[in-house]
Amino acid sequence: MQPICDRELHEECGVFGVVGVPDAANLTYYGLHSLQHRGQEGCGSVSVSKEGAMRRVRGEGLVTEVFNEAKLANLAGDMAIGHVRYSTAGGGGTENIQPFLFHHNTGDFALAHNGNIVNADLLRNYP
């Protein structure tokens, strides 16, 4: 029996998050940069300030193309989550770049995942 030699990467997307770290967005930036081999279509990050305000930056392109010093400075806070995208479903465009930021009557939240949300339409219309 011949051994199977597979020399291709089979990694899709990357998620990085930190809690309780000063300048969390900067650490998340470097985390996303180190995960960039997992997705190069786009990236994004959401930070949470001490007051609970959420801010997001996202865009198409490499991590170094999407973020700059001014954008990172706007992401003040000690919590952040980021995502690099490699699409397996859905189209391109900024609207599909994570993290997603939701404003709900129960509170705001950000979500980044590595997979497909198959019931997104149902969840979108949930009361």
What name fits each language-model region?
Residues 1-121, 126:
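N-terminal glutamine amidotransferase
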